[in-house]
């Protein structure tokens, strides 16, 4: 498992600010990275790569490990959608139907792992 880089206090503060409407780059970046770290801790592994450009990416979910090139299971979304998914403000299926997620590969589905954290709307 990768070493955490964002403290719980800093991550929670950024997440709270982002959910309250703070769209500054620093706040969004910290909130996104914090939630990616939470996902990697919740579902350790290397079979799925989750990308949230331009702020971060993580590998998660146990299973076959790739070592070279593009991983076979990739999920990509924007920062706002990632925050919404990770906090239960939108569900996986809705985000897929609205084309807010690009997912490829047989394991590229996080519906059973989300939301990571529940926040009041």
Where are the model-predicted features located?
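Feature captures hydrophobic
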Residues: 1-121
């Amino acid at each position: 498992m990768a070493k955490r880089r964002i403290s719980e206090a800093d991550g929670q503060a950024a997440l709270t600010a982002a959910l309250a409407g703070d769209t500054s780059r620093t706040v969004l970046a910290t909130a996104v990275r914090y939630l990616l770290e939470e996902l990697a801790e919740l579902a350790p592994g290397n079979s799925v790569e989750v990308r949230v450009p331009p702020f971060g990416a993580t590998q998660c979910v146990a299973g076959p490990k790739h070592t070279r090139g593009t991983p076979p299971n990739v999920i990509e979304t924007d920062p706002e959608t990632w925050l919404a998914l990770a906090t239960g403000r939108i569900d996986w299926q809705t985000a897929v139907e609205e084309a807010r997620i690009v997912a490829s590969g047989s394991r590229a589905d996080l519906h059973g792992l989300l939301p990571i954290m529940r926040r009041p709307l």
